[in-house]
Structures are given as structure tokens and as C-alpha cells.
Amino acid sequence: KIMQIKSYTKAELKVFIHSEFFRVLNKVPISFQRGWSQYNNPYCSDDDILLWAAYENADLVGYVGVLPDIIPSENGEKKIHWLSCFWVEESFRQGNLASQLFYLLIKQYKNSLYISNFLLHRIFK
């Protein structure tokens, strides 16, 4: 079995969610509606990688995605990328797939990656 991790930019994501491959996947890394919303996000640049999906043959076995955003900063505005989804098939959790996906995410957005946990905000409020 061959594993492949595919990254999707804005344009590639649009093609992907309209593809026959997307329609026949056993599981999808993003819904059509969310993919279309990502494509139309005004903060999304053409070269932003929005999603990394891991496939073994034609089966989805993991994915990680981001949501581009703009926040206020000392110098005006700063472009950031929110971690928006992260999943690995249970049978692949003993391997290093989660680490591989997270590494690609950090490598791409190390200075602009934001992660939040609203449950922790309620606990420590």
C-alpha cells in the first residue's frame, strides 16, 4: 500500500471539491460547502495551502487544514492561519502520520499558525 500526502491550494481545492475523485471518496477531508467557503474567503491568497490530505491508495486516512484570517497587530494587520481541522484514521494513529501532517503545517505556517481551544477558555475564565 502506498501513502501519499497531497496539499491543496485555493485553486486546487476548488478543482478537488468538484472532482469525480471527491465524489467517490469513502471519507472526505472537507465538505463541499466548507471547501467553497474557503475558496471564497477574502483573506485567502491563491498560494495559501488550505488542506493536506493523506491517502492510502484511494482511501482518506488523515488530514489537517487551516483557515486564513487577518487580525489587528502593532503594525496594522497580520495574516494568520487558524488550525481548523485535524484527523487521522484510527488504524493509523500508532504510526507517525499525525506527526507528518503537523510537520507540513508547521513548516508552511510556523510564523502565522494560530490554534485555539474554546473549552480551555471557559475552564480558565
For each predicted feature, which ranges?
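Short, flexible loop/turn elements at secondary-structure junctions
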Residues: 9, 56, 68-70, 85-90
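Conserved beta-strand in the GNAT
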Residues: 51-53, 59-69, 82
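Acyl-donor binding region in acyl/amide transferases
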Residues: 74-125
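Catalytic micro-motifs at enzyme active sites that drive phosphoryl/nucleotidyl and oxygen chemistry
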Residues: 41, 51, 67-74, 96-102
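A short linear-motif detector with a strong N-terminal bias
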Residues: 29-33, 45, 61-66, 90-94
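Short amphipathic alpha-helical segments, especially helix-boundary/capping motifs
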Residues: 9-16, 62, 78, 97-102
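Short, solvent-exposed loop/turn segments that connect beta-strands within catalytic domains
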Residues: 45-46, 57-59, 72-77
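Short amphipathic alpha-helix that is part of the acyltransferase structural core
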Residues: 1-55, 82
